Amino acid sequence: MKKIRNFIKDIGCLLSLVILISCTDIEASIPPSQSVVSISGTLPVLYIDTENHSPIVSKEVYLNAFYRLDPMGIEGIEALGTKDEPLPLQIRGRGHSSWKGAKKPYKIKLGQKTSIMGMPKNKHWALLKPTENTVAGLQLGHIMNMAWTPSFRPVEVVLNGDYIGLYFLTETIRIDENRVNIYKQQDQETNPDLISGGWLVEVDNYRDECQITIPENNQWNLTLRYHSPENLSNAQLQWLTDEFKAINSTIYSPDKTSTAWEEYIDVESMARFFILQEVMDNPDGFHGSFYLHKDLSNNSKWIAGPIWDLVCYNRDKSDYTFKMKVHYGFTPHWIGEIIQYDSFCKSVKTIWEEVYPNKLNEIFGYIDDMVLPLDAAWRNDCERWNEDPSQTASLRADRIKNALRRNIEWFDKHLPVSQYASLSIIPEAEKNTPTRVFNLQGFCIGEFESEDQAMSNLRKGIYIINNKKIKIK
């Protein structure tokens, strides 16, 4: 009997220990319900209260909630709702790896289309973790004259009475007259005349619903998520699959003088997209958050963009970003083939001359204007989430500006040149410019007064000179 009592006692102690450990683990994984940190008072504040103060735990299921926006006396910002009469919205989680962090990103859907802090009316918005990369990347989208680039506004957020820090309230990517302004194709469309346009898709690297997957080459697949339309008929699904098989086939054509891929893809938009990824040194540019859209018309093509989820690796560039190693194994799609086409390289050069250096130099003042005023809010955010307090707004601004300067100067010296360049007549305006010599990797290795001078000073090898492949013996 004594042995039985001792056994029961031991089991009880063990269970108590398990419960204690489990509760401790749970508490450690959940941020405190009430933060000891409060708003900085330097930015508008977005107050959100879910029904019954229910926690937001799902990326799929919206919770009903109410909101109000307090401008905090900032000129030009309109208040929305009041404490006594808040406005309706729905809220859920969003993101892939970002959702795993302590500070969560959110997707919100307002009760009606509303203009917030000067941004055009819409129901759909995102609350994103603020980074200097977002500030720089989205402004570069405007500088590069992309078809449409999301806007954002910094806000501090109080969720269910708890201060959760600094966020960027950001326009989400949707087909809408104020966003991706193209024809909106209906779900379950079967009319073949209407299926060929009104598409918004994303080259993705995560398994999800609403996707098709086709072989890109002998080594990896190409996965596309269709955002709009979202619920496809068999006819829509077949058209989209056939379309991207055809696009992929033309891009991977062994004949890199072919123009077949240009019948599907807008070359200029792809060149602008490429330049932006290089200036940012964003290794995710061609494998995740790589959006394409297509309008409905007889001559419509796939437009690269909008841009989203931009990072900057802040490293010394030694090659094009899509060729440089990163710590994860996702594969960049298409760009390794596209960069071999002469039409693409020429478009890159034309656009670069349009933006470099004057337009690109505008980014540095913009970064200071946007990032430095966030200092107090960023400090409170770091305290709230126990992040490094040394990451001041000034440090963040200097870091991204220094990275952009390095990337811009590197790219200016390494504009891509196709080894399959056509023997086209050099335009009159270019005849008096220095003769630039490139190796087969597309790197400029020198400038000379003439082609003859270049050839007399080069070692044995194969070079690209005046858009011609020349072998020096």
Model segments located where?
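Bacterial N-terminal signal peptides
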Residues: 10-22
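Conserved NTP-binding catalytic cores of kinases and kinase-like/nucleotidyltransferase enzymes
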Residues: 27-135, 139
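Middle-to-C-terminal accessory/interaction subdomains
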Residues: 43, 54-56, 87, 101, ...
